[in-house]
Amino acid sequence: MGIKGDKKATSDQARLARLTLEGNSGNEEDIQFMIKTIIETTGCTQAQAEIALLDTDNNLYGAIDHILDAGDKLDSWTEQKGAKKEKKKPEEGSYNNRGFVARGRGGGTGFVDRGGRGRSNGAPRESRDNNRDNRDNKEGAAPRSTRGGFEKPYVGRGGRGGARGGYSRAVAPSSALEPDAFTADLDENQTKVDTTVTEVQPPVEESVTATVPTSSAPAPISFAAVAAAAHRKEALRKHQAQNPQPAAPPRRSLSPQPPLPSVAPVKEEPAAAPVFFEPETSHQPEKEDGFFQNESSVLAEEQTPNVSTHHDENVQSTPEPNQAWTTQLKTDLGIGLSEAPGLGLSPIPSAAPVQIIPDPGVEFVGTTAPTNIHDYSFGFVEAAPSPQLPSTESSAASISNASENIFNSSRIMPKQVEPERTSIPNGDYNLKSTSPPLSYGQSNRGLSYDTSSASYQPTDRMAPNKFNNSGPLPTQQSAQQHQPQQQQQQAPQQPVQQQQQTPPAQSQPTGHPQQHPHMMFTQQLPYAPYMNNYMNMYNPMPGVRDEQYTAALMQYGMGVDLTSLLPTAPLSQAASAQQVQSGQQRETHGLMDFNKFGSQSSRDQQPQQASNVGPPPGFQATNYMQQPNLSSLFMQQYSPAPHQFTPFMNMMPNVGSSAGGRQLYGQDDERKSYDKMSGSKPAAQQNQHSQYQHNGGNLGKYGMNKPYNWSN
């Protein structure tokens, strides 16, 4: 209710107001009579009559006068709506008249052919061409070439993305599909330019001034087009530099148009773009020829129109900042300067210093304009020209070298910084197997072992499993506190275990006991590939809370004794040291003593586990790890190769608890033979039965009646 233009709503309001007014309820018939009278008198609608009566407080004559005075404006709401609708029509017409079709920003109301964001869908070609021709004829300029090159509206003007993406999809097809229309435009263009320029032709400077006003607003140059044209232009520029035109006095271009000798001096253009030999026409037809016939002059078209033609009185101010930025950027990057002698790479009016090029067609603004010397100097310098860019090749080479230095230095910089990054004591985040050893020593300061003493570098794979990874943490201090204890404990154990370990590589000199607390962790690393990630999850550093877990794990880690698996002695010593530290009084050299094992292990192990800290979650060491320890320990000594690839298989419950599981790996018979050798087979068998029954009946004697009770 009460919305503008809603007649029914206003009439309802009028009725409600009329009903609520005092004394009106009894005058309904009078009001209806007055409404009829107003309608008959003025020919208005009933709603208008009611509103007029309401506005005039039920004054019949006042309401009639109000309606007659208002006339057409009586319903101001609907009248405004009509005005809005009528406004849209002239707007559409004005868009079309202005040639908005080729300059639209997206698909607006009147821009049928500007499809979407910068992808000019070339559907209504005819309307586009007609609009362009009409616009160009109105402007009195050469059609198509005035917008910064051939059919610039397609190239740089397409939607929001057209200017950045280089040529839109319609460029090449339009030039290829419409050669007749294009040549017709060329002929018109040539005749127009000839008429405008021929009188002034001998002094080329005037030809420039004659053609300058023909330009319309400058179109931005797409870097893709510039880069594409750079290679093609380079050959032409070198060719032109080798064959210099006699009538080209070098001029430093300070006038708004940069000297473009390949384009501005009309007589030299055939050499640059030899496809069309039309020496008498001014630059624009030739630019089109170059673009249409030989794409080598794309730069010329894109830049000369932007530069030379864009500077009429209205537009001069706008292109200069944009093109100055473009030129400076290109000069820094050395994009187009390979074609230096022929073309000022930047479309800027030669305010940019590097753009000084021998230019026969533009007069020098300063007082001292050298006439016979080909030199390059900064614009607005009225002293003798400073040979900033001595020659084409040298300038191009120097720019390329500079660009190479820039890019190479940017590439080299991260390399120089990387060692510093990896050396941050950030532990595992920067550990790489390829980084220098220095970074290891520094990044692993928190790991209380000396990585430089290790026989190999820690691999990336182990890195995420390390815990002490940043700075000298308390673990390092505690590790250092425990080092003397470890050394004392390992000193007697080393000779025993080195005798026990059969591989010769395991002989670690006893003169270096201080390395073993360090080696204890590094030697453990290679076993992560064996899918036993628990080894690294439990921190073997002494003085840390979970050292007893680690001791139990190191001894019984995978159902086999790790001391028999590890390739070098220090790790086995570390394991034994861990056991002694964690309160297990079991003698490590007794592992190889068969007689001791049968009698001692079952007796010692049960009470120890009862009094010890419990094994890590998922490991019930006492119930299924003893017998596999015995058999696999002996097997490892004689055939270590096969079990290094499947050391974790003995962790499976059926392996530890059933003879069938053992027979899968060929261990049962050998275990029995080992038991016979030790002379303690009855004890071992008794231990086996009691072990399984000790589990509360979860496992039968030899069969898996139930799943293993991991929480027991």
Curated annotation (Swiss-Prot):
Superkingdom of this protein's organism: Eukaryota
Compositionally skewed regions (Polar residues) per UniProt: 431-458, 597-612, 683-696
Chain intervals with Low complexity compositional bias: 241-255, 474-510
InterPro entries named in the record: TC-DDR_regulator (IPR051833), UBA-like_sf (IPR009060)
Span list, region Disordered: 79-172, 198-217, 228-265, 410-517, 594-624, 659-712
Gly residues composition-biased segments: 156-165
Skewed-composition ranges (Basic and acidic residues): 79-92, 125-141
Keyword Cytoplasm appears in the UniProt entry: yes
Function: Antagonises the activities of multiple heterochronic microRNAs such as lin-4 and let-7 miRNAs. Modulates gene expression and cell fate specification during development. Plays a role in, but not strictly required for, the formation of stress granules. May be involved in protein translation and reducing the expression of mature microRNAs.
This protein's name: Prion-like (glutamine/asparagine-rich) domain bearing protein pqn-59
Organism: Caenorhabditis elegans
